[in-house]
């Protein structure tokens, strides 16, 4: 995961305005909206979130909310990216402190990658509604949602690839496909009660161990 994701959007009145086209005040109001949604997702499932309540909590007028996000799905997608950014900034801050302290990560590629995915799974364990939202957004055909999720995926992949020193590009690509696919399936089974959290972690770790066996 990497901080500072900029969500690109298509031009048009039925899609959210690009962050890069916003004034400082507009970016602040947009952040207030996504912050409110993130807080609400810790309390309720995505389908229970109402735009009016988001407006009330964020103290952003309902009309302004709809100018920024024409649909609830767009708002949820932007909030998912914002939540991911929070995790990314925290991770990068920890890595920065370790570098400044001269700490050397002597773990194998496999162990580093497994640790990163365990960390992501713990974030979903603390906020299972984010896992539910992730699955909903992954199934969406909306162009803005798909583009937002692609930005998020690319950022997360960049963070994972940074841990794969010495791994050939073709091997790394297949590893990401395999681990991400297992992660998505594990989240679907876990949130539906068909798999325990421990089972979800084990599935992801096992696949990571298999595809990165030569880098243990």
Residue spans of the language-model regions?
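Helix-turn-helix
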Residues: 32, 40-74, 78
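Hydrophobic alpha-helical segments that form the core
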Residues: 4-8, 170-192, 200-211
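Amphipathic alpha-helical interaction segments
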Residues: 32, 111-119, 133, 174-182, ...
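Generic hydrophobic, amphipathic alpha-helix propensity
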Residues: 26-37, 54, 79-87
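N-terminal intrinsically disordered/low-complexity leader segments
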Residues: 1-28, 39, 95-99, 216
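Amphipathic alpha-helical packing segments from all-alpha helical-bundle domains
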Residues: 88-92, 141-177, 202-205, 209
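Short secondary-structure transition hinges
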Residues: 121-158, 189-191
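Hydrophobic alpha-helical connector segments
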Residues: 92-126, 201
């Amino acid at each position: 995961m990497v901080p500072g994701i900029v969500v690109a959007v298509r031009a048009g009145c039925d899609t959210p305005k690009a962050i890069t086209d916003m004034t400082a005040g507009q970016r602040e109001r947009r952040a207030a909206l996504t912050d409110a949604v993130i807080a609400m997702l810790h309390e309720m499932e995505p389908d229970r979130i109402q735009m009016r309540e988001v407006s009330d909590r964020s103290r952003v007028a309902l009309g302004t909310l709809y100018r920024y996000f024409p649909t609830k799905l767009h708002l949820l997608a932007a909030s998912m990216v914002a939540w991911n950014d929070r995790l990314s900034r925290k991770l990068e801050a920890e890595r920065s402190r370790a570098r400044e302290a001269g700490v050397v990560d002597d773990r194998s590629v496999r162990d580093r990658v497994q640790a990163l995915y365990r960390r992501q799974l713990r974030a979903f364990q603390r906020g299972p509604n984010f896992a539910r939202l992730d699955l909903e957004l992954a199934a969406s055909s909306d162009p803005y949602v798909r583009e937002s999720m692609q930005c998020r995926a690319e950022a997360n992949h960049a963070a994972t690839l940074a841990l794969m020193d010495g791994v050939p590009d073709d091997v790394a690509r297949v590893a990401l496909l395999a681990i991400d696919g297992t992660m998505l399936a594990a989240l679907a089974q876990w949130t539906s009660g068909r798999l325990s959290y421990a089972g979800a972690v084990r599935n992801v770790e096992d696949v990571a161990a298999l595809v990165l066996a030569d880098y243990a």
